[in-house]
């Protein structure tokens, strides 16, 4: 992970009241406006993994039917690991970027090989997850969040956009500072809800590129825009 770039300003210190306000507003917005998506009704790590890999670079509307069909064809890690690659790729058709299907199958195969019991399972710690093929820092953290509600921060481009915009910070924060920011505003005990709120807010309100600008809100001004000066 890249750190702070040379000559980059230090990350401002957020006032506690700002953090609490951001958490309350985003979670309140989510409780009233959150999307109902099938992978949000499960805590099965394998199903969560399938959804996370499918959602990379593919629209939600295209993923939903494929997600259901995939879990019918390969309901367990063992089923996917044992499936011929050509069958897996056929099941993936329509989602694009076939390397994701290969990575998903490789990950399942590795989990099965390292299983200590009769049933394969994905690890529950970040270091162990990162040792599996095809899992990067975001996907590994997302598994811990959505399957186990662990208090870790999972940062992707949408989370970057929401946090930096809503807190009035530079969108070009270095990866180290961005991770520190995400951890600083994480409401402990509500990690899963918080990350879903960030994702839905980024998808429905603070949209990605539109009309030649980096992002565009569909309503008003930022939820919170109060950042203190840097710590001495």
Ranges and model annotations:
Residues 10-18, 24-231:
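Catalytic cores of DNA base-excision repair glycosylases
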């Amino acid at each position: 992970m890249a750190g702070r770039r040379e000559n980059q300003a230090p990350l401002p210190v957020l006032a506690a009241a700002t953090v609490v306000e951001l958490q309350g507003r985003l979670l309140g917005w989510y409780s009233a406006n959150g999307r109902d998506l099938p992978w949000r009704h499960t805590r099965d790590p394998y199903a969560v993994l399938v959804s996370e890999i499918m959602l990379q670079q593919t629209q939600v509307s295209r993923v939903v039917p494929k997600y259901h069909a995939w879990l019918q064809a390969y309901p367990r890690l063992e089923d996917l690991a044992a499936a011929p690659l050509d069958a897996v790729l056929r099941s993936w058709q329509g989602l694009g970027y076939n390397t994701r299907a290969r990575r998903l199958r490789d990950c399942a195969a590795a989990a099965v090989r390292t299983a200590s019991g009769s049933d394969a399972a994905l690890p529950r710690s970040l270091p162990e997850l990162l040792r599996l093929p095809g899992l990067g820092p975001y996907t590994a953290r997302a598994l811990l969040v959505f399957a186990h509600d662990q208090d870790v921060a999972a940062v992707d481009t949408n989370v970057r956009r929401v946090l930096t915009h809503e807190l009035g910070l530079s969108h070009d924060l270095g990866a180290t500072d961005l991770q520190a920011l995400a951890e600083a505003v994480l409401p402990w005990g509500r990690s899963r809800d918080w990350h879903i709120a960030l994702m839905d807010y980024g998808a429905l309100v603070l949209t990605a590129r539109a009309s030649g600008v980096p992002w565009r809100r569909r309503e008003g001004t930022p939820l919170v825009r109060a950042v203190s000066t840097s710590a001495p």
